[in-house]
């Protein structure tokens, strides 16, 4: 069997505080800083900044 990968699932929460989020994989060995992307938020119908949070 293959070894379990080291990638983690993280939640990218909208900075517009709409409650909308994306789930993304990340490799903790390569990325030290928190992820942040400018992506589309369908609740406000605009591109906003999405920042990394812990996935519960």
Swiss-Prot record:
Cysteine disulfide links: none
Cited InterPro entries: Ribosomal_bL33, Ribosomal_bL33_sf, Ribosomal_zn-bd
Pfam family name, one: Ribosomal_L33
Protein name per Swiss-Prot or TrEMBL: Large ribosomal subunit protein bL33
UniProt KW keywords: Ribonucleoprotein, Ribosomal protein
GO molecular function terms listed in the Swiss-Prot or TrEMBL record: structural constituent of ribosome
GO BP annotations, alphabetical order: translation
Cellular component terms per the entry's GO annotation: cytoplasm; large ribosomal subunit
Gene3D superfamilies on file: Ribosomal protein L33 (2.20.28.120)
Signal peptide annotation: none
Family: Belongs to the bacterial ribosomal protein bL33 family.
Coiled-coil residue windows: none
Species per Swiss-Prot/TrEMBL record: Ehrlichia canis (strain Jake)
Ribosomal protein found in the keyword field: yes
